Amino acid sequence: MALMMKSSASLKAVSAGRSRRAVVVRAGKYDEELIKTAGTVASKGRGILAMDESNATCGKRLDSIGVENTEENRRAYRELLVTAPGLGQYISGAILFEETLYQSTASGKKFVDVMKEQNIVPGIKVDKGLVPLSNTNGESWCMGLDGLDKRCAEYYKAGARFAKWRSVVSIPHGPSIIAARDCAYGLARYAAIAQNAGLVPIVEPEVLLDGEHDIDRCLEVQEAIWAETFKYMADNKVMFEGILLKPAMVTPGADCKNKAGPAKVAEYTLKMLRRRVPPAVPGIMFLSGGQSELESTLNLNAMNQSPNPWHVSFSYARALQNTVLKTWQGKPENVQAAQAALLKRAKANSDAQQGKYDATTEGKEAAQGMYEKGYVY
């Protein structure tokens, strides 16, 4: 009887030990560096320049100004961006495409070194794009987990210190349970792999603007997606202090008749964040998602009119580059003017991050919409 009691006690002890081990928080070798990197990117008055367009998408941008899509033209445009004088005052990080990570200026200086001199943290797009998700109503899933650990290790060696993975969620097509879970689980696995390689993961489940849905439906979907995403990140022992989020703002669909101004967008977006995002997360870096330059800046400014538990900032591509590209036109003599346009937009969003943006200084071009239905990044 005593032996049975002893055995029972031993089994309970072993079971308790296993239970405790099962919930031990990860302790990776890069944890301190991840927290430091995330803090640098999420620094006051600064945000992210997203310049990670694929070569095909970059080609569309160049074609819009009559410039041929060659590696040299892509390099020249990217050099214009990263060498803008004083850019680091407003930009804390830049997301690069793989080609860009290894490119250099015309004088032979690596882009990553140019960025580091301005205290701009180099980042890298690591997903491999979207493909149709079987047995759903036109939804998609994101490729790129195969070999991601090796790629992240190589990107770290090349100077990258954060990563980005973009999945998308379509409201008109669902989202279905399978699409929502696939999106969330893929983001969680990516985040865990990136952290283990020393890269701060930017987590981006983009809820597309496509559709006629109202702002309440957008709120409902965003809350569901972020709940799933944080659940799976917790399961994968992702360290929340070493991640950044890149959500879409909570807005009505592009075809909804009931539009929402900055105050309402801010109200709904902050409501979603407070319900779903732990305060341990250092930074919320919003995507513009096809909003005009002016609209995306006004909405960000509205969200920073009162203190938030996180650094609420921007990670814009088109909303920073649209006027820049039109000013440049592929001509060397326009580089200085194009860089001035970039700095103007970067400063505007820096001011918005601090809640002190003044829209009276904007020109008509900033209000031009950039929404494209079914946009492929």
UniProtKB/Swiss-Prot annotation:
GO MF, one annotated term: fructose-bisphosphate aldolase activity
Site residues by UniProt (Necessary for preference for fructose 1,6-bisphosphate over fructose 1-phosphate): 377
Gene3D superfamilies from the UniProt entry: Aldolase class I (3.20.20.70)
Cellular compartments annotated: Plastid, Chloroplast
Keyword Lyase annotated: yes
Record's catalysed reaction(s): beta-D-fructose 1,6-bisphosphate = D-glyceraldehyde 3-phosphate + dihydroxyacetone phosphate
Top-level division of the source organism's lineage: Eukaryota
Catalytic EC class: lyase
Active site: residue positions: 204, 246
Pathway in which the depicted protein is active: Carbohydrate degradation; glycolysis; D-glyceraldehyde 3-phosphate and glycerone phosphate from D-glucose: step 4/4
UniProt keyword terms in alphabetical order: Chloroplast, Glycolysis, Lyase, Plastid, Schiff base, Transit peptide
Alphabetized SUPFAM superfamilies for the sequence: Aldolase
Entry's Gene Ontology cellular component terms: chloroplast
Residues given in the record as substrate binding sites: 74, 164
NCBIfam families: FrucBisAld_I
Family to which the UniProt record says this protein belongs: Belongs to the class I fructose-bisphosphate aldolase family.
Protein name stated in the entry: Fructose-bisphosphate aldolase 1, chloroplastic
Species this chain originates from: Chlamydomonas reinhardtii
